[in-house]
Amino acid sequence: MSRYTGPSWKQSRRLGFSLTGTGKELARRNYVPGQHGPNNRSKLSEYGLQLAEKQKLRFSYGLSEKQFRNLFVQATKVKGGTLGFNFMILLERRLDNVVYRLGLATTRRQARQFVNHGHILVDGKRVDIPSYRVEVGQVISVREKSAKVPAILEAVEATIGRPAFVSFDAEKLEGSLTRLPERDEINPEINEALVVEFYNKML
């Protein structure tokens, strides 16, 4: 299954969950798209609930099903902690996500584009792989030639507050993951246990 590239508001309304984190797309129409949207939310089966929760998390990070499933498999090999939380941590450590958390992009999709286009450095070296796994303490910065890209500057200007697990210097356009996040600091609306149940049946 390929990565979804359509409007995020449609997916948000279909899932009843804000994929952008702002909630704006649900403010006026908190129902699925289509003519019968308001009356089209039926009660989900156990499998349906698990699938919906998996889709919420997958679309939030903008991954294809293959990427998402492969990362889950990697999480099963992490020692200590719960499988669901370990999976969430691996999602958070993706370079595109850290760029988004630092406020260098307004969305994860935009952050992925910045990484793909070579605008982002890790410890001074250009990394153009969105799935690159960031370590605590690594310095994420904007390449000198990209420091005046309007979209990056606008994102930094528009960012109000950043998670407690990152640090950021707006003048230098650089920051880092200072520690791994706690569970209540990332996607508290997601029930990752349902995602684990879904994949335990599939794998």
UniProtKB/Swiss-Prot annotation:
S4 RNA-binding domain sequence ranges: 93-156
Keyword field contains GTP-binding: no
Biological process terms in GO annotation: ribosomal small subunit biogenesis; translation
InterPro entries associated with the record: Ribosomal_uS4, Ribosomal_uS4_bac-type, Ribosomal_uS4_CS, Ribosomal_uS4_N, S4_RNA-bd, S4_RNA-bd_sf
Superkingdom of the source species: Bacteria
Keywords: Ribonucleoprotein, Ribosomal protein, RNA-binding, rRNA-binding
One GO CC term, this protein: small ribosomal subunit
One GO molecular-function entry: rRNA binding
Function: One of the primary rRNA binding proteins, it binds directly to 16S rRNA where it nucleates assembly of the body of the 30S subunit.
Family affiliation: Belongs to the universal ribosomal protein uS4 family.
Subunit structure: Part of the 30S ribosomal subunit. Contacts protein S5. The interaction surface between S4 and S5 is involved in control of translational fidelity.
Cross-referenced PANTHER family: 30S 40S RIBOSOMAL PROTEIN, SMALL RIBOSOMAL SUBUNIT PROTEIN US4M
Name listed for the protein in its UniProt record: Small ribosomal subunit protein uS4
Species assigned in the record: Streptococcus thermophilus (strain ATCC BAA-250 / LMG 18311)
Biological classification of the source: Bacteria, Bacillati, Bacillota, Bacilli, Lactobacillales
Encoding gene (name): rpsD
